[in-house]
Amino acid sequence: RQMCIRDSHLADWMAEADTVLLEADGAKRHPCKAPAAHEPVLLRSSDIVLAAAGLSAVGKPLQDVCFRLEAACTLLAVPPETPLTPALLAKLLASEAGGRKCVGTRKFYAVLNQADDEARRAAGEQTLAILKETYDVTGCLTHFEKGERA
């Protein structure tokens, strides 16, 4: 169920905060996704956009880890059984049909979550290097410690 807030109320609340994080589209608990035609829903006043993905997806078939699989396969030009590589993840995040969709002139960054072990950190570092070298996109690795997870 969606909850809607009037634009005037949202603007008032946002004016009271230093930073406001809004989820523009969800991934139905999948670690990566491609946006639907109507996504993302960005406010005109948004000045920074973050595209997030979970590193648990790397090395696994797209069909097992990607929300909106058909859109992702079309964007990446690969079949559903293709394992997600750092290069494919970087392309998915940096593409203007993917994570960078509708960003325009806003600042854009990639956030790679679930860097929970050495293998995932290595995949994340490789993805970040490809993002920087190929797409001029800056990003970061994140993870939660056991006590921090919901």
Tell where the protein language model's regions lie, with residue ranges.
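Short, small-residue-biased leader/transition segments that mark boundaries at the very start
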Residues: 1-5
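Conserved catalytic-core segment of NTP-binding enzymes
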Residues: 6-15, 25-134
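Hydrophobic anchor at the start of a short beta-strand
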Residues: 19-20, 108, 137-139
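General beta-strand structural signal in soluble alpha/beta enzymes
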Residues: 20-24, 51, 141
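Canonical P-loop GTPase G-domain recognition
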Residues: 129-150
